[in-house]
Amino acid sequence: MQYQSFSPRQNATLFWWTKPEHQNRDGLICDGSIRSGKTVSMAIGFIMWSMASFDKQNFAICGRTIEALRRNVIVHIPTWLEGMFEVTERRSENKMVVTIGNRSNTYYLFGGRDESSYTLIQGITLAGVLFDEVALMPRSFVEQAMARCSVSGSKFWFNCNPESPGHWFYKEWIRKAAERNMLYLHFTMDDNLSLDEKIKARYEGMYSGVFYDRYIRGLWTVAEGLIYTMFNKDYHVVPVSYTHLR
């Protein structure tokens, strides 16, 4: 993909923290369709905000696994930040150091795979955290990472694709964004100016039903009707009497 200029929604993600009406917010939530440009604009915005606001502080960048985080985000950051910052990744320590002039900050990488993952982030003091694909992480991990943000001025940055409307993140953060003093931005594929129109049309033709609503429209919708389209009542429904067989 050849990166083009940023869309208005991406620019809002990059610079929201500079706007007087948003400077006192506790963070940013971006959700929406696949391939909508959330990840690139949020990663750049997070680094820009942290480097402009802090020096010699620790931050966390979290994904479902460190491997997925590296593949989807970290490996691209030197290119995305080229000409702005010097980026040094220390793979053996699962961290990267970003520098500009005499100012530098450290960004630790964490994976929130399961309920035990919260123990990995205990103890560290953070000035901010970015959650990439937060809906794939357990609540215990997310809340433990947020609890580490005790530095004055720290903020939370979340992005995700939609899941069920019963998902804890949707109920506790997206529906309560204003109550929690968060800025909420919803993305669609039209917000990604780098996405070719033919590719966009292909994605739109790949899905239907609940998956179209989630992946293309970026909506938190619940599955209805048959989950398995190959279902056959005569073949798959077992008579009650069969359940008594030993």
Language-model segments: residues:
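Inter-Walker segment of RecA-like/P-loop motor cores
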Residues: 75-125
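ASCE P-loop NTPase helicase motor core
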Residues: 136-206
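Pre-P-loop entry segment of helicase/translocase ATPase cores
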Residues: 1-26
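ATPase catalytic-site recognition across NTP-hydrolyzing enzymes
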Residues: 192-245
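Residue-level preference for the first positions of well-ordered beta-strands
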Residues: 27-29, 58-60, 107, 128, ...
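Conserved P-loop
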Residues: 27-90
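SF2 helicase catalytic motif II
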Residues: 127-137
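Conserved beta-strand scaffold positions in the cores of enzyme catalytic domains, especially
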Residues: 61, 109, 184-186
